[in-house]
Structure formats: structure tokens, C-alpha cells
Amino acid sequence: MSTIPLRHSRRQWLPLFLLYLVSTLIILPAATLAADAGVKVSRFAHLPSKVSYFDDSSVVLYHDATAGVVYRSEDEGKTWSPVSGSSSGKAAMLVPHPYDKKQAFILSRELTHWRSTDRGKTWQEFLTPEPPATRAGPPMEFHADEKHWDWIIFTGKKCSMWTPWGGRICHDEAYYTTNAFATNPPRLLEFVMHCNWAKATPEMQTSTDALERIFCIAWEDAQEQRRSMVAGGTGGSTRLFQSDDFFKSRKMVELDMGRNARQFAGLGPSKRFLVTALRDSQGSSSKAGTEMALFVTKDGVKWEKAKFPHGSELRENAYTVVDSTSHSIMIDVVDSVYDNTGVLFTSDSTGTQFVESLRGTRRTPQGLVDFEHLVKIDGVGIANVQSEAEGGVRSMITFDDGSSWHTLKPPAEDDKGKRIDCDPSDAENCALHLWSVSGKTNVGKLFSSVAPGFVMGVGTIGKGLKNYDECDTFLSIDAGRTWKMVSRDAHKYEFGDQGSVLVMVDDEDVTDHVSYSTNFGKTWNKLSLGVTMRAKVLTTIPDSTSLKFLLVGSQTRKQAGGKDRNVVIFLDFAEMKKSKCRESDMEKWYVQAAAEGSCLMGHKQWYKRRKPDADCFIQDKFHDPEDKEDPCPCTDADYECDFGFVRDKQGECVATGNEHIPEGACAKPSDTYLGSSGYRKVPGNTCDAGKGIRKDEKTQKSCSGKNMPQKGSVLHKSFTFPSLVVDKMYFPESSSVLVQLADGTVFQSLNDGYSWKQLNGDGAPSSAEDRFLTMALHAYDPKRGYLITAGQRVYYTTNQGASWSWFSVPLPANGLGINILDFHPDRSDWLIWTGSRDCTFSTAKQCHAEAWYSVSNGAKWEKIDSYVRTCSWARDKKLKMDARAIFCESYQDKKGNQREFTAANRLELIRGDEFYRKRTRVFDAVVGFAVFEQYLVVAEYVTTSSAPGLQLHVSLNGRDFAPIHFPPGMQLGTRAYTVLDSVTDAIFLHFTTHSEAGSEWGTLLKSNSNGTFYTQSLDFVNRNDKGFVDFEKMMGLDGVAIVNVVSNPDDASVSRQKDLVTRITHNDGGRWKSLVPPSRDVYGQPYECNKVGCDLHLHGFTERDDPRDTYSSPSAVGLMMGVGNVGRKLAPYRDSDTFLTRDGGFSWEEVHKDAHKWEFGDQGSIIVLVNDEQATDSVLYSLNEGVTWESYTFGERMRISQIVTVPEDTHRRFILVGTPSGSATKSVAIYLDFSALESRKCVLNVAKPEADDFELWSPSEERAEQCLFGRQTYYYRRKRRADCYVGEKIVQPHSVSRNCSCTEADFECEFNHYRDAKGTCVLYPGVSPLSTDAASQCWAADSDGYWYERTNVRKIPYSWCTQGSRPDRGTRHVCSNNLRAHGFLWWFFVIGCAFGLAGLVGYWWAKKQSSRPGYGSSGRIRLPDASNRLYGRDSELVQNLASVPRFVLGAASAGFARFREIASDRIPFVRNRLDRSRGAYGGYRHLSTDEDAAMLPDFEEEEFER
């Protein structure tokens, strides 16, 4: 019975139990699904300067550089504690070992530092002889070989304290350790710039013999460097040294330049390569010595020079080694400094042959380039280019390592599924553009991570990139092929668990949550943080395999509520308790190129990746995803153009110049050689050529028809043009030449004239508007040229004619005699176009000129002004005006036919600032203006009571103008004038004094240094009826000029028959003298005229067919040639002979009878002559500067009009242009190649000059010492009988030995003075000398503390002479600013008062601070070493000083600079003191490189925004 109630009880509870069980089963999964990520907040006093994870571990370090403390977490940032040891308050730098996963270093600013070998758990103290140096790179360089990870190079900063006044000078010293600082490191090398191990990266295939090798950039002579640093200079040239025994012995790395391998600027690794940069003293361009050369090594033994396409200039601080691959180097070279754009080049697998990949890349002034490779994805990279679209920046993506580029395909819908109003097929107006490296707001890689295929970015859809706060956030899960918008507004983002978790946080405003997605961005959830903050950094472990993240942010005081304002939030998505993915949750994901399913870099790369909808986590922590590859057959897409080839319009790779023929090949035309096919496989491409096409295989080519002469012989080839040649244009430093024909066609040769092809726009000319009117070479950019048509289309090249494009202009070119194109000196894309409107018919009533400008190389135009005569950029190479200013000659009355305008319609000179938007009338009426070097000269039309006339003005800044003063009796009036030259800090001007037709001449005037006061240099200087003057400066030697003078002015004014004589100056017009004639002619016979007055006379500038022909050469220093005669006057041209000088015109010799045209080649080692009196079928050439001549016959007789070669005269190939006998309607070009006459390259050995092929030569005036312009300057020139060719451009001058003592040759007549018959400078009758300007002398940079009364002479502006005779100085007076002008008591009183006042102010400040509440409390900002110095760097006094407006400090700096100039010459100790207190590293330079490139990275610790 008792059991019945029990049974009944069970029956009652059973339903309840079942209900509970079912409820539990239902509730538990729901609870599991609802589980969210964990959030843990930690607070810190300051933001970190670095957050560093130990690879493949959960340990992370947080470096607070402000407090000098390093914190450590063992659980990926959940909990934190300061590291052990005594580094607290002293940690200035945290340096993880890049290869050893357990080592890290804490560096202080002093000598004591700390090392950990157990991921920061314990720290051991170690000492270094000097504190760390970060001037030229990181202070520690690590050996990359696993057996040598404890081998470290440490660079320290050594400073010397001296004098009671403080101050110091510093230099870098290198030390090394082979046991990770277990013992004190010994010194490696003193006075270094930077050192690297030969095994600098794990990828480098360093030879076994070079594993212990160290490379250092250092000064060859440490003592010389020490002396130069004390003197305030940069010292001797840096060189690259190597050592295999820690510099117990060392060897200079000569590369292939011998002892010219100097002035190294950088050294650093890039994946498989070690790269060094130095100044290229043996380049083939005219900029040799100013450009940089790159050398590359893969094994630490053999260095090879990197070769770039023609016209690519590597200037110091103007290139960046960017995020390269393991199989090639990518370098971005500055293309436009002011527009911050570059050209991206990619190398072959050797790292030496570079081809252009992308033009117009966006870069910052600091050298950061908007380019990044996607992590773990072969061949895919994203770059930004500058454009004229809205926003100005467009994003491009490559899927073949830069061989081709495409725009990013935008999504069709926004994050809410709403259709975006944009047509993706219109890539020009509808593309995705992303913020890149230059706008980086997070740490680590910008776009991608190890998570395969995942790419995120912040950007906009449209024509171009918008401001960051106008952007949205986008995601791609297929390596950039397609994109989707995942959120409005800009966000920071991070990837976790190989892409299973995506996290992003608002990057525009404060936020209290993050968003995350576990299904590849399909849906997003919010995770509350529990605090409101401004996100600074979002990061996770480097391999993105963890489910834990760190979010660093900062709060306002109100948000923090009195707590520390910087928060580190630990986000733990492992707490979501998702299951571990199984094999069925994974899929094979292929990296696809732009075309669906296609191969990428010659293979199909794939990863195992979680399926997008799989509800699991991979949870394979610390294990990077491994890629697999399926090989593909080679296709056209797997090849790119080889070095020296570019793609034409049909997409084929064609040679850009002379094709390289192997040395020794082509001994005769019937031979063959193996040459490039024009293609090479894209570096890193692994396609199977056996199963596809092979385009990179060397091909057998015939020597027949190749421009390769047989050894010891000359090669020629003729080409007949269909019309007469009327103009030519040779691109500097190239083999590209253009000729324009009379029929309006243009022909081009890319191989110095060996072969020619006609240039057409889009096929054959179809109308008269397609005729070419003229050619224009960019005045400042040697790579650019323009072909102007009769219509509104202009063809242009940016690569010296290798390829051509076109742009449209708003109006046809003007036919009003006005310059059509004007070029900006600094910004190659900035153009001014002057066209004509309504000028089609001669009877047009409103015909006028209009000027337009473009800042996009013709892509877009803006109107400047109408009815103008000239518009040009105000800025010039030496006239440093605002870059956007424009000068225009603009007519006052803007109506009517401009062709019929008279002086009644005034021509105003307008300066338009901000691209002519703000206009200022500079002069009411002008005749014209022109810029000459640093001088802007304006001819103003003035009307006086007597008669109208001209007044010249000059300006050095384009704003302030001063009238030009001529000698007495020389009033310009309406006389003609010609501004001739201004390269030697003075203007030469020809003032016409006799303008009768047939007997024109004038006076040659020369200005002072600011162009205002002119003195007579030479009278009766010849000119012609067009205003051209027989005046020519010698190229390569400053101050040497040749003129022709009318010797019979009285007779010539009546007979109009001028007798000309030649004069030369070697001191810039200070004195003129006759040309010393040779004693005998070319046959050794004496001249008929051999008495006093029998001089050498040469035909000058006014008689030349082509004004571009010159006496001298820019590269053959000291050489000049001319046609003339020995006698009492210049004989007719056909009665003249040919003469040569080797020493700048001091002595001459006759080299051939009869008049000849001439041209220099190979920097003067070859001279070519052709008869200029009659038709000829041969040329003469000399390989020994005219000692002997050889004749070469080229075939049919022709009347030669021109000898053409590259403008620098550095080639051994020439073009003869002429007309055949009996034909006056067609021109013929004869190609001549002399390169096989000499096979040995001249040797320049600085160490053993007696054993090389060059001699040092110094031009000399008529004085006891060898000086020119008061300076002894040495030039290299090939020995006259050396059997070799020069080759690369020699940097001239070689050296400046010293400044010479002043002599009479360094002075010229002062204003209002002239030279009388005795050569003495005398005052013009009835005038007064200029008054003395004492102030300008006393405040001049070279003032000696005195001012001097004027005399009858002045020092030639360009003379460098010092001391010696100074006839320009009269009575001496002490300057008022001279310290010697005051006595000892005066200076004692002034200095004492200053120190007393400073002491009172300091005492008052200290008392005030000590009485302030809270002074010295914990809230005060302290120095990193926690000191409490009142006048420390971060003291409140300094902070207040920092708030003073900059112009006040600028004024103080200017005053101090002025004081230094005075005091350094007055007080003995002040000179050295002021020179030495120039900061710790005055005189050193930084090499601008990419942050992500290993080559000299900026090793500042400011990785995070503060």
C-alpha cells in the first residue's frame, strides 16, 4: 500500500520532467547561438609607439615610448604587466628580432639596454659603447642565416662635448656582436653611414664564402671626415667597403667604376637582393654626376648595375624601392616633383634590367608610394595613379606583376542592396578607387593579410578618389577581382582565423562598438565595447590565424571619467564557441585573374579555404595557409617586353633604339647573331612553355642590314626622303631623332638615323589639318616632344619618341608669329598654348590670339586671356617665382584684327597669379619681355614730350623692377637691342648704334650682378639686319666668348662694306684681344700675312645656316672649331680654311684647307668634317683632334647642309643631311657609324693617372698661375693620341683646386667708365661716378666688416678670386655692424646686461612655477627618463615657446644668421662655435624610401598616430 502513493508521485512528475528535458534541449542551443565575443578593457597612460607580437605565439608587447615602459601580455592582450628588469622609464625603442621568434631588444637613449631570449618573459641587461643611432637606418642589423642569428651589427651615435658653451658634434660608429650582446660588442668601423650583413634576408642566396661578409658605407679617410665635420661640411666622399673579418681588413667595393665608385647614399635589402645607391659619375647622360646609379647583388659577391630605359633619371631622394617580390625588384622613380607622381619600374629575375610598368604613380614628398602587393597572392598588386578626374587619384590593379594594369571593378549595389547609379562598363567614369599607403591609418599591410583572397579598403566609386571622410568600406574575397560595399563611411579593418572573422571599426568618429562578420562579409553584427572611444589601431597576430584582436583607442577626459584615457580592448571571438571546421567545411579556392577561370603568373594558384556559409572556425592557430599550384601552358599574357623594347599600337614589342649586338658578332654582313626576341617572361611566372608558346627564346638574326660596322671600318647607309628636310629635332641623351619635311610630314629614327619611318597620327594623313606644322622639344624635360598639326590635334611623346599619343587643343596654332607652346621649368605636364581665333581668312575682322593653359599635359585646358602676343610661365630654372604665375603681353583694346594693331593699342604686361585668376598690371605699355637665367628683362614703351622711346627694366623676382642704366650718351630711344647671354651672373646686351641696312653694328654692354648698371665691354660689334649678333659663348668653359667687330666703321657707314675682325675674351668681357694665329698652315708653310696685325679671324653666328651649330661642344671641353683666315680682316667664306683650338681659344692651329662644316663626337675623340664649298661624296674624320685626317667615301655626290648628332656630342654616329647633285626637291640622310674604329674603351684611373688615357688640363689666363675666373679648375680630356673611345659621359669639371689671387684680369670698368686707348678705365666726360653704397657692402654675405669707396673698376661678378690686388676697393671704412666699431667696455656692458636680464627672467619663472599648485605632481608631462628638469625639452616653458607664431621665430632665426655672419669673422671662438652647433647630424642627408621597403627605412618609433 505504501508503494501506491509513490507510484502516483512518479506519474505526476514524469510529465514535468519530460517538459524540463525538452525545454533544456531547446534552450541550450539557443544559448549557444546567442554567445558573443568576449571584451576586456585595459587602460594605459599613453598610446603605444609600437605593438609587437612574437611570431607564432600569444605573447605581445606594448611599448609606451612617452613613459619609457614596455608592457607584456601572455594571452594576446587580455592582461598586461610591465616587463621585468630595470628598463622601466628608459625604453626608447623596442626592436624584435626579425628572424628569431623568441628574441627582442629594448634600447634606451643611453648605454644600457636589455635583451630577452624567452619572448619577453625575462630581460638581461647589456651595454654598448655609444647610444643608438637612427640617422641612416635602424640601429641594429641582424644576420639572416639561422646559424648566425646572434650576429648583430649595432650602430651608435658618438658625440664629443667641448667648450664651456656646450654644443657637440656627432658621427656614427658601428659595433658587432656574435653572441647577441652576451659580451660587450667590439668596434667594427668608425665614421660610418650604414652597415649591412651580406646575408641580409633569408631569401638571399648568399654564397658560403660570404656568410660572414659585412658591407659598410663609410668615409675613406676618417680623419678627413672628422676635420670636415668640425668645419661644418659633409666631408669627403662616402665609399662602400666590405670585410670578411669584422673589418680587421677591408676592401673597397669598386663595382665596375674603379675609384669613381664613391658618394654612396644608401644600402639595404629587398627580398632576394641587396641594393646600393651611389652618385653615377660615369653615366651616359649629360646629367652624369647628378643622377644616381643602382647596383644589385644576389650573392654578396657579384654586383651588377641596374639598367633603366632611356630618359629615366634616378636622382638622389627621388626614387623608392617599393614592396617588391621575391623574384624581382620594383622601383618608383619621381616623374614630377611638384605633382608628386612617379613611374613604376619592374626588373627581371636578375634585378638589373628594368622596364616601365606604370606611369603617374602617386607618391608623397617623403617617398611613400601608393603601391602594395597582396599577401600570398602571386602577381596581384594595387597602385594609385594621379589623374585629372574628380579627386585626382585613380586606383589600378595588376594580376601579372605589373605587366598590365586595370581599373578596379566597382560593386553594383551598396551595403543596403540599393543599386549604385554607375555603369561599371564605363571604366573611365565608374571604377572603384581606394586609399593606399600614403593615407595609411592602421598598422601592418594595408589591403590584405595572410587570409587567402581577402582584401579590404576604404574608397569611393566614380571618376576618382574622394577625401577620406567621404569614403566607404569595401571588401573583396577573390583577390581584388570583384568587390562589394560592406559599410558606409571609412573603417579600420582586420582579418582573423584565415578570414573566418572580419572585424571593422569606425575610423571617422568616436564609437562604442565594432562590427564583425563570420560569413565573408555577407552579414555584419555589432559587438558592444562598453566604452566610447576614438579608434587608433586594430590589429591581431601577424599571420591572421587567431580569433583574438586588439583595438587601441583614446578617450576624452569626460569619456575616461578620471581614468587613463588610452584604452586597449581585447576582443575574443573564440568565446563564440563555434565548432572547429571539418574537411567538408573547406573548399579549393583558385586565385583567378581578371578573366574568369584564367591562369595567373603561369599557374593556377589555389588554397584550401573555409566555405563562406560554413558555421565554424578553422582554429588552426599559428599555421599560415599553404598555397598549391597547377601549371598552365604559356600564353601571350605570360610575356612582357624585354629591356630596350616597348609595345607599339598593335601591342607588339618593338625596339626603342639600337638593338644590342653581342661583342664580337657581325664581323661581316653575312654573319648571324643570337638576339632578343623582344619579349621576356614576366619575372616569377611559372608557365610551361613546352605546352604553350615560347616568345622569350633568343632568335637567330642576320647581321645584314644591321647598324653594326665591321671592326676597323666605317658603316654608312642612305635614306631618301620624299621632300626636303626643313627642320630636325634630336632628343637629348638618346638615339631618337625627328626630321620635318617641306610637305608637312615627319620622319623618325630610333637608332641615330640608321632606319627611318614616317610618323602618322592614326594612319595616313586624311586631310590638310593632319599636316605637321612644326616640332617642339620640351625646353626642360628631355624626354618630351610635341608635333603640332594644322588642326587641333597635338601629338606628344614622354619617352623620347618610343611611343606617341595625342591631345586636343582649344584652338588651331596661331599664324601670328607668336610662340605656340610654352613649357614650365619644374612641372613637365604644365603647358601654355597660344592659338588663334577667327583667323581662317585674310579678310577676318576679329582675328586674334588666345592663350590657354593645361596642368595635365593637354588633357584639360583653361583659358588665360585673349588678344595677347605672348603668354608664358613666370617661373624659370633660376627665376624662382610662384609656380602658378603667368606673364602675358595683353592688348589693352581687345577688338578688331590683331594683325593690324599699331602702337596706339597699348600692349600691357600682366602678371597673373594663381593661374592668371589674380591679375596685376606690371607695365602699361611694353614692347616685349624675356627671361634670361635669373633675370627678367622688360622693354617698356615710354612717351616723353620729345619723342616716344624704350626704357629697359630688370627684375630678379618678377615683382620688383629696377630701370636699366646705360653709359652716358647711350639712350635707348627707339634703337634696337639684343639680349645675348646671362650665364655668368651678368647680362650681355647688344646696343645698336648704327642701323643702316648693310652696315649694322653696335656696342656690347655688360651688367653688374643684378642687371641694372651697364658698362661698355666692346664697341662696333657686328650684327645683321635681323638683329642677330656675332657673339658666341664657349660651351663648357665659363667666361670665354668670341665676337666679330667692324674694323672700318667710318668707311662702312658710307660704303656698307664691313671689314670684320675677330676678338676673344677669357674673363667674361672684361678685356678683349685678337685670336693668336698659328705660325704655319696645315702644310707647314708660313702665312703670307705674318706681321703685327695679322690675326686669326673666324666667320660668326650671323653667317650660319643653322643657328644651332656652334664653335664648341658641351662635352668636348676646351675644343673649338671655326672657318676663317689669317690676315688683317676676315676673308670671304669660300676663301677661308678650317681651324681648331684645344685650350679654349688661347692657341689655334689650321687643320684643313677650305671651308668645312664640322661636328664633334664621343666628347671630342672623333671630329667629322665635310666640305662646305661644293658637293662632295666623302667626309673627313680625325681620331686625334686634327693631327691626322682620314677620308671616307659614302657614294653619290651631295651638297651637305647639316651634320647631325646627339646634342651632347657623345655618340660616334652621325647623320649627313643634304641634297643630291641635280635634285633640289628631295633630301637624303647618310648614316655614318664610326663605332668600330676603336674597340678599346678609354681607361680613367684616378689612383694611377700616369697609366690611363686621360690628362688633367686647366685653362689659364695670361697670369703667372693657371687660373680662369679667379679659380684653378681641372678638366679631364682624352690624351690626343690615345687609341680608345671615351664612352660614358665624364663629369666636368673634375675638381676645383683652389681660388686664385686677384689680378687685373678679374676686374672690369665700373659704371660710367670706359677703357681708353691705354686700357685704363676712365670716367666719361661730364658725368659723376656712382655713389658708394655702404649698407650693401656691410651686410653682404662676404663682408669683411668694412666698406670701401668706389673706384674706376669693379670685380667681375663671376670671378672667384680672393686676396691679391683689389683695385676695386678705395678708402676703407669700418661698418657700423662691425664688432670692432665698439670698444671693450661697450661690449662688456651689453653682454652683461643681457646675461643679467636672462638671469632675472629665469629666477622669476622658477619662483612662479614653484608656487603653482600641483607643480611636480604626477599630472605633469615628464621626459622619457622621468627627470623633472625645469628647462627640459618637454617643460611648460618650451611648450609655451612652441606656440609662438612661426614668423616670429623666423625673424629671430634670420637675426641670428646675420649675427653669425658678422660674429664668426669678428670673435675668434664664435666662428667655430657657431659652425659646430648645427645639431647632432648637420651635414648628413636622408635617403627617401618607402616605409615598406627595407632599403634604408625611416626607423622612427612613431608607428602610431598620437
Swiss-Prot record:
Residues 1405-1506 are cytoplasmic. Pfam families: Sortilin-Vps10, Sortilin_C. It is found in: Golgi apparatus, trans-Golgi network membrane; Prevacuolar compartment membrane. The keyword Nucleotide-binding does not apply. One of its GO terms (cellular component) is membrane. Coiled coil: none annotated. BNR repeats lie at residues 71-82, 114-124, 396-406, 474-484, 516-525, 795-805, 1181-1190. GO terms for biological process: Golgi to endosome transport; Golgi to vacuole transport; protein targeting to vacuole. It comes from the Eukaryota. The keyword Transmembrane helix applies. The chain crosses the membrane at residues 1384-1404. Keywords: Glycoprotein, Golgi apparatus, Membrane, Protein transport, Receptor, Repeat, Signal, Transmembrane, Transmembrane helix, Transport. Its main location: Golgi. SMART domains: VPS10. It is a single-pass type I membrane protein. Residues 1-34 form the signal peptide. Gene3D superfamilies: 2.10.70.80, 3.30.60.270, YVTN repeat-like/Quinoprotein amine dehydrogenase. Residues 35-1383 are lumenal. Belongs to the VPS10-related sortilin family. This is Vacuolar protein sorting/targeting protein 10. The gene is VPS10.
